[in-house]
């Protein structure tokens, strides 16, 4: 099946973070592609990737970048697809703040949906939710996933009670 989500990153050094987006999309059974597209080192590749994405069948692009983190915004500027930005705390970043602010502070007309620092898993979930608006099977998988999160927390609450931690809520 052709990919529905593109996962791109500025460098292969970002793969350890962006892997989480791929993992959650696999869990939901959503076909996707993963590659390196640098806004600074391969600008022509970036433009070609973004401008051909829709015609290639992609519905959402997840773009991760560290440092100056121009990739998500530049991709968003040349595609009509939703772009989800993942700020990455890199070796040359200012504790990740430069990446966060570069992706968050986009001008009017060029939105980038932004997740937390290194939160590629949430980017994958958000991409799945976007796809789920038009696909009931994906929507149900997301609902099941969220139910499992609820169950997991309630099991931990019960374990805490068994371990002697009391509260007046339960």
For the regions a protein language model found, what residue spans apply to each?
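Short beta->alpha connector loops at strand-helix junctions that form conserved
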Residues: 9, 36, 65, 86-89, ...
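Glycine-rich phosphate/diphosphate-binding loop of Rossmann-like nucleotide-binding domains
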Residues: 2-41
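Proline-centered loop/turn at the N-terminus of a beta-strand
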Residues: 4, 82-87, 110-111
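Helix-adjacent hinge/juxtasegments
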Residues: 52-98
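Amphipathic alpha-helical hairpins
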Residues: 5, 31-55, 64-67
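Short glycine/serine/threonine-rich phosphate/pyrophosphate-binding segments
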Residues: 14-18, 42-46, 65-74, 93-97, ...
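C-terminal binding/interaction regions
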Residues: 3, 9-16, 20, 96-170
